[in-house]
């Protein structure tokens, strides 16, 4: 079965599972939708009545990892549909959600085992209507965020090894992030806007950029149909990120993050007594004059650095820290307005 056949088969399976017993259940969303832009073709996105998932295949491997990303999304939709059925009898807890996600990632890895090395990040969110709790599971640097009244009130933690080096689900056992994922929880309210997106969004857009997309879509949709408001939010966010590829004159969040890692690298080099003194001094002077360090706009920067892995050289980091043009990448956004 090739990737296209697999995805079609899984979509049919997920539809059947979702329809069983769900016809009278309104779900947690008053509006839900998604939008994408394909550059490498390695992202995948999906959603059901009370859950959303985004996976971002790593394009730096020998093979395109979009296959694994699509498998992860398909298996997650199936697993969370089953969790939703069970939750009608007993409200789920973080551990229940975590086990469902572990089962989904394990199944996807098994399906991808004979396809060579494939890597992907993933983030999924599940909403429980009874407790009003949302559960977030993340491996890598996809993000789950919540806006309330135009303000950012929740941001999930990225799991990373180094600058622009996320932890991944991998078909290669040595690469796969095997540490137990800590599920994050948040109590949501009616009218909250939840967005799930790949790093093609937060590498290029600041918090106020996305807040603007959310706000303008709400105003626009109020004059038309509120049922399409979430999809409009997703579409506007994708377009705003795409616009940075060609018409951006300010430093992007990717540059701001790189500047921060430059300062970390400076501290590490200072502690390393084997570094040439003249080279260190040159790097120190360059770090002191990085203009993106002066950017005050809020970025989506919450992360857990779970391993010290110096992947990029100091010169690479300096180059990234001066980046103004958008970082071209796949862009995937799933948005929901909570009921």
What name fits each language-model region?
Residues 1-339:
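PP2C/PPM-type serine/threonine phosphatase catalytic domain
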């Amino acid at each position: 079965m090739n990737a296209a056949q697999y995805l079609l088969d899984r979509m049919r399976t997920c539809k059947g599972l979702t329809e069983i017993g769900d016809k009278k259940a309104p779900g947690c969303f008053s509006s839900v939708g998604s939008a994408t832009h394909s550059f490498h073709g390695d992202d995948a996105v999906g959603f059901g009545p009370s859950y959303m998932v985004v996976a971002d295949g790593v394009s730096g491997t020998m093979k395109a990892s979009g296959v694994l990303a699509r498998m992860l999304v398909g298996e997650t939709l199936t697993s969370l549909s089953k969790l939703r059925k069970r939750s009608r009898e007993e409200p789920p807890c973080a551990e229940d959600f975590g086990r469902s996600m572990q089962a989904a990632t394990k199944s996807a890895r098994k399906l991808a085992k004979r396809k060579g090395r494939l890597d992907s990040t993933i983030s999924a969110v599940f909403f429980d209507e009874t407790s009003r709790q949302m559960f977030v599971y993340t491996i890598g640097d996809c993000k789950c965020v919540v806006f309330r009244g135009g303000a950012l009130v929740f941001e999930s933690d990225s799991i990373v090894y180094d600058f622009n080096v996320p932890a991944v689900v991998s078909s290669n056992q040595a690469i796969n992030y095997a540490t137990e994922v800590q599920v994050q929880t948040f109590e949501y309210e009616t009218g909250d806007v939840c967005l799930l997106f790949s790093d093609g969004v937060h590498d290029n857009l600041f918090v106020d950029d996305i807040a603007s997309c959310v706000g303008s879509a709400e105003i626009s949709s109020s004059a038309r149909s509120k049922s399409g408001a979430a999809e409009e939010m997703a579409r506007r966010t994708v377009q705003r990120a795409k616009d940075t590829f060609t018409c951006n004159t300010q430093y992007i969040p990717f540059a701001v993050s790189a500047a921060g890692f430059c300062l970390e690298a400076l501290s590490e080099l200072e502690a390393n007594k084997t570094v040439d003194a003249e080279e260190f001094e040159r790097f120190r002077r360059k770090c002191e004059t990085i203009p993106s360090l002066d950017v005050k706009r809020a970025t989506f920067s919450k992360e857990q650095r779970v391993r010290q892995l110096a992947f990029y050289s100091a010169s690479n980091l300096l180059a990234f820290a001066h980046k103004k043009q958008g970082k071209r990448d796949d862009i995937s956004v799933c948005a929901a307005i909570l009921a």
